[in-house]
């Protein structure tokens, strides 16, 4: 499904003033009908007084870099974009299946509780209140998903811990809402999958007879020494997976890289021994 930006939106301020005028007029008609005992005036004034609040439901306010996906009786009507005060069909419903989903990212950080799990679903209730208002607007800003550290085996079978930060944004609101069940959860899962797929190709440090490019020739690629190349491959794989969800992956960066604690001491000793051997070779040469 392709995004359709609404072009027939109306000025919200003008429509609000019009509805206020009509509501005041309806009250005046109702009063006049009651005073002069005019049944038609009473009926007209009563009807508009009872339903005159409905058009106010169509008033929408958008901040910069926000969008609102609207449906009418289940059919996709279009996407409201650009900041401003607008009026649309009051029976239109805003749709955002990821509105309650909180990722460990900029834009979703709540009160500094960034140490929580990568994916936390809001319960919709808070202490002292029976329900919480859910904002159905979709942010078009660049956001950073800070993926938690994962333990993954490199191509030599050594367990390493690695974490990445992914900069992303929504580019097609219709695809994000209708092509996947929850685009935030989908992005998080694809980041985990891409990270595992790429890390398994590389050794932690440079190792002999290892082909990381897939051309059949051994190279010196490694997680520690080729971090930018590894991050680029992770970004490309994530982008390939989330393109159908209307998301753009701007950049991926490795934020943490280390051997897993259970082998860290052993690998450190091995690195030290290798460094001593290399130093002796240089002295001999």
Go through each PLM region and give its residues:
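N-terminal membrane-targeting/pre-transmembrane regions
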Residues: 1-20
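Canonical alpha-helical transmembrane segments of integral membrane proteins
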Residues: 15-31
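Hydrophobic alpha-helical transmembrane segments
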Residues: 28-50
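Short Pro/Gly-enriched beta-strand edge/turn motifs at strand-loop
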Residues: 48-52, 144-147
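Aromatic-capped interface at the extracytoplasmic side
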Residues: 53-66
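Membrane-cytosol interface motif
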Residues: 67-90
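Amphipathic, interface-forming alpha-helical segments with heptad-repeat character
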Residues: 92-96, 100-256, 262
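Long, charge-rich amphipathic alpha-helical coiled-coil "stalk/tentacle" segments
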Residues: 237, 261-285
């Amino acid at each position: 499904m392709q995004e359709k930006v609404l072009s027939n939106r109306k000025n919200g301020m003008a429509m609000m003033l019009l509805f206020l005028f009509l509501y005041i007029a309806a009250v005046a008609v109702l009063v006049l009908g009651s005073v002069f005992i005019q049944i038609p005036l009473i009926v007209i004034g009563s009807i508009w007084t009872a339903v005159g609040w409905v058009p106010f439901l169509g008033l929408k306010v958008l901040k910069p870099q926000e969008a609102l996906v609207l449906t009418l009786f289940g059919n996709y009507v279009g996407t409201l974009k650009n900041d401003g005060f607008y009026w649309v069909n009051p029976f239109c419903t805003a749709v955002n299946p990821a509105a309650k989903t909180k990722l460990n990212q900029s834009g979703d950080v709540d009160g500094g509780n960034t140490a929580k799990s990568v994916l936390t679903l809001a319960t919709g209730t808070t202490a002292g209140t029976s329900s919480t208002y859910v904002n159905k607007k979709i942010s078009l800003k660049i956001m950073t998903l800070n993926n938690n550290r994962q333990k993954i085996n490199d191509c030599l079978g050594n367990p390493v811990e690695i974490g990445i930060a992914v900069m992303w944004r929504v580019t097609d609101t219709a695809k994000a809402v209708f092509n996947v069940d929850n685009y935030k959860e989908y992005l998080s899962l694809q980041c985990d999958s891409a990270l595992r797929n790429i890390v398994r190709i590389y050794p932690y440090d440079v190792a002999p007879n290892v082909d990381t490019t897939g051309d059949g020739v051994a190279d010196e690629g490694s997680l520690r020494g080729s971090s930018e190349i590894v991050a680029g491959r992770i970004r490309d794989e994530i982008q390939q997976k989330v393109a159908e969800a209307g998301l753009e992956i701007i950049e991926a960066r490795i934020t943490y890289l280390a051997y897993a604690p259970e082998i860290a001491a052993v690998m450190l000793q091995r690195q030290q021994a290798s460094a001593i051997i290399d130093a002796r070779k240089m002295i001999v040469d």
